[in-house]
Amino acid sequence: MAFENKIVEAFIEIPTGSQNKYEFDKERGIFKLDRVLYSPMFYPAEYGYLQNTLALDGDPLDILVITTNPPFPGCVIDTRVIGYLNMVDSGEEDAKLIGVPVEDPRFDEVRSIEDLPQHKLKEIAHFFERYKDLQGKRTEIGTWEGPEAAAKLIDECIARYNEQK
């Protein structure tokens, strides 16, 4: 039986091209400007999280969605998860899922990070390696993992969330 990619609902906080780091305040039901990036860089993809998950850093599991056109903050995108980037942010594991919109035919054949242009993966890794430099914070970029490992990571983060409830 062939592997089926996980389909998730990605809750988008930050659109592609933004230098603003927005965070959704769940208690108040509003978006808040967390900070403007210190570096002259911009988010290389839609950035958000998966609701009802808990990653090792204590936050919901992060996700980047590669899109044709940027959505608005608060948009939920049905996303095919194609892998993730292992990284460490300020000493904590901070995996970044990578996915593509289910409802965009331009991505119908994209099932793995290997199906993306290598340059796009380099842009994403470079962004996360450097975006906190001017804040004096350190990030370390690890390996790229495929869709099977991403599915396992999602399941672990859902289980961790359910244990914490």
From Swiss-Prot:
Cofactor(s) annotated in UniProt: Mg(2+)
Positions bound to Mg(2+) 2: 62
Molecular function GO labels: inorganic diphosphate phosphatase activity; magnesium ion binding
GO cellular-component term (any): cytoplasm
Binding positions for substrate per the UniProt entry: 21, 35, 47, 131
Main subcellular localisation: cytoplasm
EC number: 3.6.1.1
Oligomeric and partner information: Homotrimer. In presence of divalent cations the trimers aggregate to form a hexamer.
Annotated protein name in UniProt: Inorganic pyrophosphatase
Organism: Bacillus sp. (strain PS3)
